[in-house]
Swiss-Prot record:
PROSITE patterns with a match to the protein in the record: RF_PROK_I
Pfam families: PCRF (PF03462), RF-1 (PF00472)
Protein name from the UniProt record: Peptide chain release factor 1
Subcellular location: Cytoplasm
Lineage, highest ranks first: Bacteria, Pseudomonadati, Campylobacterota, Epsilonproteobacteria, Campylobacterales
Function: Peptide chain release factor 1 directs the termination of translation in response to the peptide chain termination codons UAG and UAA.
Post-translational modification (record): Methylated by PrmC. Methylation increases the termination efficiency of RF1.
NCBIfam families xref list: prfA (TIGR00019), PRK00591.1 (NF001859)
Protein family per UniProt: Belongs to the prokaryotic/mitochondrial release factor family.
N5-methylglutamine: modified positions: 231
Gene Ontology cellular-component annotations: cytoplasm
Domain of life of the organism encoding this protein: Bacteria
Key words of the record: Cytoplasm, Methylation, Protein biosynthesis
Any one GO molecular function term: translation release factor activity, codon specific
Length: 355
């Protein structure tokens, strides 16, 4: 019975309450913080679980009263209100029972790179960045460009941005992969539709505790930063390239005039990429056959097509087609895509957990 699956969560919540009131725990700040965090994570589930149990018990009691001459009609009326509540509560609880992704509340580095399609691909990087920026604005998040490499005809060959706010990774983690665009470029005189692509990486930001990179594991090169077309824009060696020797991961930052600032930015990105690389290994070892493997690593996997002539957006992983491309791109109404992706991921997780 579903009720029986709920009891361990309620028991653990009550156990934490007892532990938090014990003098031993009160004197151990780290343990107290850890337990408080666990309890606050369980609270929404326990609240729904108690409501589910109360509702199920009330249904059982009213069913027993159906044959009663005096109370039968009242019991029937109560049941008509209570019975539809149970399946709805069960679905809500199942979502809360899904093991939480420890990275969901983290800020991210968003990395966009031009792929096949030359100049048109670089222009699309700028368009997609604007789409994410507008969505971030709606969500109350803060966007800061970390590094850019300009395209020869506008746009960006590469753009790295930091996005900070509540639940950023939980909303954007399914964006990683290849995004394909089909449209008529401004330079096209015959009106032919061209296809180009960009890759998107969504990397959770990490702190020093999560990733420990030793100084002797990093090789640093400095060079003069260059602008569009390769001309030098700085007379000092302010650009920084960091190489993580154990993994071969390379990060180059040249946006700041100060070498020190570029190094700090590069180190932050490097730590996040090393963390993501470790995360990817774990995912490869443990992930099932889910369509929505987060950051499935294969950046070549085509996840979405943006067809401008038809105003159509298609997400190939879940078979979602929307004829609202202008709304998504110009207004940042990415919820139209993100909400179905999250719902699909939750359904897969519920099935995988056997709930």
């Amino acid at each position: 019975m579903f009720k029986e699956k709920l009891q361990p969560f309620i028991d653990r919540y009550n156990e934490i309450s007892e532990l938090l009131s014990s003098p031993d725990i009160a004197s151990d700040i780290n343990r107290m913080t850890e337990l408080s965090k666990e309890q606050s994570g369980l609270a929404p589930l326990v609240e729904k679980a108690n409501l589910y149990i109360e509702t199920a018990d009330a249904i059982a009691e009213n069913k027993e009263l159906l044959s009663d001459e005096e109370l039968g009609d009242l019991a029937k009326e109560e049941l008509s209100e209570l019975e539809p509540m149970l399946p709805k509560l069960e679905e809500e609880i199942k979502i809360l029972m899904i093991p939480k992704d420890k990275n969901d509340d983290k800020n991210i580095f968003l990395e966009l790179r031009a792929g096949a399609g030359g100049d048109e691909s670089a222009l699309f990087v700028a368009d997609v960045f604007r789409m994410y920026s507008r969505y971030a604005e709606q969500m109350g998040w803060k966007v800061e460009i970390v590094s850019t490499n300009d395209g020869t005809a506008g746009g960006y060959k590469e753009l790295i941005a930091e996005i900070k706010g509540q639940g950023v990774y939980s909303q954007l983690k399914y964006e990683a992969g290849t995004h394909r665009v089909q449209r008529v470029p401004d330079t096209e005189t015959q009106g032919r539709v061209h296809t180009s692509a960009i890759t998107v990486a969504v990397i959770p930001e990490v702190d020093d505790v999560e990733v420990d990179i030793k100084p002797n594991e990093v090789k640093m090169d400095v060079y003069r930063s260059s602008g569009c077309g390769g001309q030098s824009v700085n007379t000092t060696d302010s650009a920084v390239r960091l190489t993580h020797i154990p993994t071969g991961i390379v990060v180059a930052i040249q946006d700041e005039k100060s070498q020190h600032k570029n190094r700090d930015k590069a180190m932050k990105v490097l730590k996040a990429r090393v963390y993501e690389s470790e995360l990817q290994k774990q995912l490869d070892e443990t992930a099932g056959q889910r369509k929505l493997q987060v950051g499935s690593g294969d950046r070549s996997e085509k996840i979405r097509t943006y067809n401008y002539p038809q105003n159509r957006l298609t997400d190939h992983r879940i078979g979602l087609t929307l004829y609202a491309l202008d709304d998504v791109m110009n207004n940042g109404n990415l919820k139209l895509v993100i909400d179905p992706l999250i719902a699909h991921a939750q359904t897969e997780a519920i099935q995988e957990a056997g709930l």
